[in-house]
Amino acid sequence: MEPLLRAHASLISDLTSEARALEGNIRLSSAPGFASRRLTSLLQRFQAEQPAITIEILSGLSESDLQKGLCDVATLTGLPALPGLVCMSRGRNVYLPVASAGYLKKHGMPLTPDQLRAHTGYVYAGPVRHETKVLVRGDRTEPVVFGQSIRSTDILAIRTALLNDMGVAVDMPLVQIVEDLLAGTLVPILPGWFRPPVECYIATSRTAWHLKRVRVFFEWYARALQALFASYEAQASAVVGLPRDDEAAERSTIFRT
């Protein structure tokens, strides 16, 4: 009887430890625009599955911040370069050149990058990615030069300006404008010209990776974002041609830098 009781006590202890491994706080860094409009509904789904895990939302931290332990999980634009990180693709960011129908009615549709000199351009200059300097069509590359430029670190402020017929942008993230495209309030410009898509990643430090709650959230979040961003592309493809996705088969691997 005594060995049986010891085995039962050990089982209870293991189950308690397992439950505690899925309790606690995770500090998540996300791009500010995505955090403002999309993130909370996604996290509600996760917390329905893991109610004992609390997610703390931070904005715009870099891979060096992640490496320093300022957050536990971060979304990064482009392949992480610093050592000591654990990463998985969350899918690609697609960037589209757009303007409002009202703006185009007043100022005309730019068809090629050189015609941007006749337009007011809104330029994203925030911390999430580098400023767009060129556009690509096939093997051709052309510089982006506006007649007038307004720079902003706030992608949502740029979206608002576009919707208010105030100018054009050549690199609006699809995630921020998919509903506007479907409603026709924003219209694709510069047919065939794009800022090339950028693969994005979920990353954590190797130290945080040892926490089970981080591992569980990390993989759930990466796959949820892959599905979400693929759904945006599927919706948008009905109204605009998108760049080919050559990386689609390579998004299931967790790797270390």
Would you name each region that the model predicts?
Residues N25-S29, A74, Y122, A169, ...:
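Short, well-ordered beta-strand segments
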Residues M88, D114, R159-T160, R215:
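Alpha-helical segments flanking ligand/cofactor-binding loops in enzyme cores
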Residues E23-P83, A234, D245, T257:
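Central regulatory/effector-binding core of bacterial HTH transcription factors
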Residues M1-S17:
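Alpha-helical "hinge/linker" immediately C-terminal to small N-terminal DNA-binding modules
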Residues A52, L174-A183, W193-T257:
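C-terminal effector-binding regulatory domain of bacterial HTH transcription factors
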Residues E49, L58-S152:
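Acidic, Gly/Pro-rich loop/turn segments at junctions of secondary structure
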Residues E142-P188, F194-R195:
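Hydrophobic hinge/microswitch elements
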Residues A19-I26, R117:
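Immediate post-signal peptide segment of exported/extracytoplasmic ligand-binding proteins
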